[in-house]
Design a protein with these regions (language model features):
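Short acidic/polar hinge/loop motifs at secondary-structure boundaries
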Residues: 104, 122-150, 170, 264-266, ...
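N-terminal periplasmic "start-of-domain" segments of outer-membrane beta-barrel proteins
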Residues: 37-72, 103, 126, 148
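A beta-strand signature from Gram-negative outer-membrane beta-barrel systems
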Residues: 36, 137-181
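Gram-negative outer-membrane beta-barrel transporters
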Residues: 400, 461-465, 568-570, 575-580, ...
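Short strand-turn segments of transmembrane beta-barrel domains in outer membranes
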Residues: 150, 165-200, 210-222, 679
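C-terminal beta-signal and adjacent terminal beta-strands/loops
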Residues: 4, 530, 576, 581-582, ...
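Extracytoplasmic beta-strand/coil segments of soluble accessory domains associated
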Residues: 78-122
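Acidic/polar loop-and-plug regions of large Gram-negative outer-membrane beta-barrel proteins
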Residues: 236, 243-321, 348-379, 431-434
Length: 764
């Protein structure tokens, strides 16, 4: 594979800088080493390495354990990203639990272009069908921190999903003392949550913990409920200066859906048959009586698909990980890891009688054993699969060099089916007749075999005032899909096997951080990335086997920034330019090598983004050390660079990417053991389609919490605490998650209304 001139230039410049600054003539006498530790103190103040990413060559910030534990109980680690600069997080509910209601964008990238890791285990793709979205795999109570790089994660972090952004979730090690914690929460919409964790203590180098959480509540919008059972465990065996760690996660989740709606439905101008409008627009909690549209078929009216029991999701996920860390001599460190994941689940969606009848007639003479539709059809999708992999990393400290190299291997096998079945009496409330299939839509398997390795050298120069990172990674993903990908495959009696390989053997990353003095740093970085095409199964299921597969999306990321660390404040500001090529888009075109026109996914050009991000915290002396402030501000312009088909979108803004994002808060500690926080988050208006003919208004949300009892104990409990969380204090009515379109009105998920939650916890 050829190396671009840009890559050559970046590496040559990096090498030249390294050689020049490493020469004896540049060995300036300096007393400074690294930037001093943060002096600002407080129970909700982060150390500089967390708050502003001190000593990092890229813009890297984190969410502390204290912040995670101050959030509403049960909130997902994904939703917590909304407190970080640049991350536009939208959620269907206050806790971010509903999978199909979550969305994330940062700089030029969306949720599926971000890499996620849990204790250095790569989480693969974030697809709700078949993926491993991070919010299924960890409770906040077990997290130590969440670290995010909005532009470019470290070259040594394994991911085939990331075009630059990386979010890493790090859990706690087991406590060396026997003990535990129990908490119970009640909240709006009949929410109940219990969390319990037991630490076993250390015994001859062995330690461990087990935890469980149980959530049940009603949907805030419409009928139905959510139910989640989640278990985690970790065992650690310290061997000399090394350790072996085993961890496991088990997640069982069930919920009912709520609909996405258009602006017209939201405004009540869409002529809804049931008079629904506003943010409470929901599925029906009853089976209505509707006119018959097909003679003799009682439930033939399409509007019967609005009954809530026809929209269901269920997932079960199991993850096991084993890690071995050990020093080798005085200069080498080895880390080996292995993991295994299994998953299964199903989703239910309705299909109207007329649609089912057409599909049934298309297949009934070809596929034996089909039944004529009786009314509204029960649409069942099932998923199952396994994912397994190994990682290895070796670091070597050699004078001014910190060398590291590693490899990642993974196999991901996934199976999906989709069929339509009759229900008793054809009724929306009838039991599904799984022995009466009406028509078949999917039954395929897909595999992803990944090989990635990296090499990195961190040089410490100028009396350790300058650190330079030089590295690259190689990524190869072999993809295959086979079976019945769509109804056309069933009708044509074909089971195609389609393969595609995406690889790049040289993806460089260059970065530097310079200590101006003991309080200030300048940093800069450049990186290139390649990612598995997002939604690969959908891409290769969209058309006939003759349609060619697309090239992988690729990206470049530039950053330059400054950090300041003072006795009463710290701050970081970064400017960036980000772009990705080979953007994927489905549209009608002639299939190469034929005269047939089909709608299939193609590479259609680039997206570029530029902007700046600020993050800081301040504890003013004149307020007696009892009040401190934090704030993040982001400015981002993300634009399409190329037109596609007949759509002139070059220069148009990418939908769902706000120009301005701001979060800020004030924390007040009036007395020891009491903490009050008031925060706000503002998102500016967003375009909702590619041609920028529609946009949704910006909004501001205010949240607050009160923590009481820090340091208070009684009886067998070392600490007893109470917390109150109020989200969306002013009950802001807004449209949050956007399902973007090309040139038509988009659909939205209204943001959740005001919620209140009370939590009582005890540690022993």
């Amino acid at each position: 594979m050829k190396t671009s001139n840009l890559r050559r230039g970046a590496l040559m410049c990096g090498a030249a800088v390294t050689m020049a600054l490493g020469a004896p003539t540049w060995a300036l006498a300096q007393t400074a080493g690294t930037v001093d530790e943060l002096v600002v103190t407080g129970s909700r103040v982060s150390e500089a390495s967390v708050a502003i990413g001190t000593d990092q060559a890229t813009a890297t910030v984190a969410i502390t354990r204290e912040a995670l534990l101050s959030a509403p109980a049960g909130v997902t680690g994904l939703k917590m990203l909304e407190s970080l600069p640049g991350f536009n997080v939208q959620a269907n509910d206050a806790l971010g639990m509903y999978e199909f209601g979550n969305s994330v964008s940062v700089r030029a990238f969306n949720f599926q272009q971000i890499g996620f890791l849990l204790d250095n285990i790569p989480m693969g793709r974030s697809d709700q069908f078949g993926g491993s979205p991070i919010y299924r795999y960890v409770d906040n109570e077990n997290l130590l921190r969440v670290t995010a790089s909005a532009g470019s994660g470290d070259v040594g972090l394994p991911s085939y999903a990331s075009l630059g952004p990386i979010v890493s979730y790090l859990t706690q090690v087991p406590d060396k003392e026997f003990g535990g914690v129990v908490s119970y929460s009640r909240g709006s919409d009949n929410l109940q949550r219990t969390f319990a964790r037991l630490d076993l203590g250390e015994h001859n180098g062995f330690s461990g913990y087990v935890s469980g959480s149980w959530i049940h509540g009603d949907l805030w919008r419409g009928p139905g409920d959510i139910d989640r059972k989640h278990y985690e465990g970790k065992l650690r065996w310290e061997i000399g200066e090394g350790a072996i760690t085993f961890q496991t996660v088990h997640n069982d989740y069930f919920d009912y859906d709520s609909p996405s709606i258009t602006k017209a439905q939201y405004a009540g101008t869409a002529g809804d048959l049931f008079g629904r409008s506003g943010r409470d627009f929901a599925y029906l909690g009853y089976v209505p009586v509707l006119p018959v549209t097909s003679p003799g078929i009682t439930y033939s009216n399409t509007a019967y698909n609005q009954y809530y029991k026809q929209a269901v999701n269920s997932r079960q996920d199991h993850l096991y990980g084993l890690t071995y860390e050990t020093p080798i001599g005085g200069a080498l460190n080895l880390t080996l890891g292995g993991y295994y994941e299994s998953k299964e689940g199903y989703g239910v969606s309705p299909e109207a009688y007329a649609t089912s009848l057409t599909n049934y007639n298309n297949e009934r003479l070809i596929i034996p054993g089909l039944f004529a539709p009786k009314g509204l059809q029960y649409g069942l999708s099932t998923v199952d699969g396994t994912r397994q992999g190994v990682t290895a990393k070796l670091t070597w400290n050699l004078g001014v060099h910190a060398l590291s190299a590693g490899v990642w291997l993974e196999n991901d096998d996934y199976h999906r089916t989709q069929q339509r079945y009759n229900q008793v009496g054809g009724s929306p409330d009838g039991a599904p007749l799984l022995n009466e299939p009406v028509h078949l839509q999917r039954n395929y398997t897909s595999t992803r075999d990944t090989v990635e390795f990296f090499v990195k050298d961190t040089l410490s120069l100028l009396d350790e005032r300058l650190h330079i990172d030089l590295g690259f990674k190689s990524l190869s993903v072999d993809y295959n899909i086979q079976g019945y990908r769509n109804p056309a495959d069933f009708i044509a009696s074909r089971r195609p096997s389609i393969s595609k390989t995406w690889e790049d053997n040289f993806l460089p990353q260059v970065g530097a951080v310079f200590d101006v003095n003991s309080r200030d740093q300048i940093f800069a970085s450049y990186s290139e990335n390649m990612a598995l095409p997002r939604g690969a199964d959908d891409i290769f299921s969209a058309a006939s086997p003759a349609a060619p597969g697309p090239e992988a999306e690729t990206s470049t990321n530039w950053e330059i920034g400054y950090r300041a660390n003072r006795p009463t404040f710290n701050a970081s500001i970064v400017a960036y330019q980000t772009s990705f090529e080979n953007r994927l888009q489905a549209f009608a075109a002639v299939v190469p090598g034929s005269s047939t026109t089909e709608t299939f996914y193609q590479n259609v050009g680039a997206v570029k983004a530029h902007g700046a991000e600020f993050s800081g915290q301040w504890k003013p002396e004149f307020l007696g050390g009892k009040v401190y402030f934090n704030s993040n501000l982001s400015y981002n312009i993300a634009e399409f660079q190329d037109n596609f088909a007949t759509f002139a979108i070059a220069g148009k803004r990418v939908p769902d990417f706000p120009e301005w994002l701001w979060t800020g808060g004030v924390t007040f500690e009036p007395v020891e053991g009491a903490v009050f926080n008031l925060s706000a988050r503002h998102i500016s208006s967003r375009f909702t389609n590619f041609v920028n003919s529609e946009e949704t208004d910006g909004y501001t949300i205010y949240n607050a919490y009160l923590d009481l009892g820090d340091g208070f104990g009684a009886g067998p409990f070392e600490q007893i605490k109470a917390r109150v969380n109020v989200d969306n204090i002013l009950d802001e009515d807004y449209l949050g998650t956007v399902s973007t379109t090309t040139n038509t009105p988009a659909s939205f998920r209204p943001g959740p209304r005001r919620t209140i939650q009370f939590t009582l916890s005890a540690e022993f």
